[in-house]
Amino acid sequence: MHEDRPWLRFYGKVPTSLEYPAVTLYEALAATARRVPQAVAWDFFGTRSTYAQLLADVDRCAAALAAEGLREGGRLLISMPTSPQGVIAFYAANRLGALPALIHPLSTAPEITHFLDVTGARMALTLDAFYGPLAAATPKQPLARIVIARIPEYLSPFKRFGFWATKGRRIPPVPADPRVRSWSAILAAVRGEAARRREDR
């Protein structure tokens, strides 16, 4: 019975497998948001989001990424620390049927080049602090879009100032690059388009 998996004989009464619903990660998130909408989904240095808000943010991000060219079967390279933007973009890509490819945010340009060649990603999300190595990568298929996020986007005003005073002001500005869009700008564009559609009704 356990010849191919001999470790199972040590499980005792513990189930050797569980029943998992045949749903996508996005669908699992949506189910959680329906079940416990006001539960805390994430806490980022004191800034919190409920599951209901996270789902709304994921839906908006999916629309924004689609507007920037991410399609079903596409790849989104995510080079982020553990921050809200990375979590939101991960589920947004899944909602679109795209594949999020997470890499270490401190990866070097040669490493990023390898990851881009392996995944075939044409779009990437990273922090302003990590733009340099990403821009210096030389994959066979160059990135078509780079979305730049910033840590203060999800901090309270007080902590936003503290971040700028201690670390943020030392981050070099992202140079002019036609491939670059800011995280806040692509989300704002989706909100603006939604507002225009409501006005046209």
Question: Where is each model-derived feature located?
Answer:
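A short, compositionally biased
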Residues: 33-38, 164
